[in-house]
């Protein structure tokens, strides 16, 4: 089970990399847009400095045609290093690019997955991660859990090294459901992780223990 942060905000990454068992940081053009006019590859280097050498970083191509996707991928790896994961949408051109890039030794995250067949094709093309869009599928009345379950079953049946990296979450319940359905990893915004600890009962339990200890020991520490 892997937990990744879906953000390029350095304050969020610094905070949550110290709290979470962080497996990686994911990004896309929409996430980059939230940060304003940044030097994108300098920001990726800053992220690497914050999270260390072990967690993965995932960067998305922009071009939509086969040759353009390859050029984007080559530039990303030149700028961000050989260990970067290239996010490629599973379109006809994207699937072709995934096959070509895997032959060149690239790490690939197949993204924009809404259907089982997209995921199955990405598995066969050699993608390291598959990123089904959980909330976006829900909004289209697609059974997100069923898609994840079928892809997880295919991975297990074929003993494939591909992993399901579920993305596009609006709440913790969706994250829980994705993992229960068979996702190997999830990526979510800092707000989703924040909400995981927002239940008042959690803090009340901690406060009660502290108060009870204070009654018998007159101290707020052991």
Swiss-Prot record:
Pfam families the record matches: TAL_FSA
Entry keyword Lyase: yes
Organism domain of life: Bacteria
Gene3D superfamilies: Aldolase class I
Active site positions, chain numbering: 87
CC per GO annotation: cytoplasm
Locations listed in the record: Cytoplasm
Catalytic activity: beta-D-fructose 6-phosphate = dihydroxyacetone + D-glyceraldehyde 3-phosphate
EC annotation from Swiss-Prot or TrEMBL: 4.1.2.-
Keywords from the UniProt entry: Carbohydrate metabolism, Cytoplasm, Lyase, Schiff base
An individual GO BP term: fructose metabolic process
EC top class named in words: lyase
GO molecular function per UniProt: fructose 6-phosphate aldolase activity
InterPro entries per UniProt: Aldolase_TIM (IPR013785), F6P_aldolase (IPR023001), TAL/FSA (IPR001585), Transaldolase_AS (IPR018225), TSA/FSA_arc/bac (IPR033919)
Function text: Catalyzes the reversible formation of fructose 6-phosphate from dihydroxyacetone and D-glyceraldehyde 3-phosphate via an aldolization reaction.
Protein family: Belongs to the transaldolase family. Type 3A subfamily.
Protein name: Probable fructose-6-phosphate aldolase
Species this protein is from: Streptococcus pneumoniae serotype 4 (strain ATCC BAA-334 / TIGR4)
Gene name tied to this protein: fsa
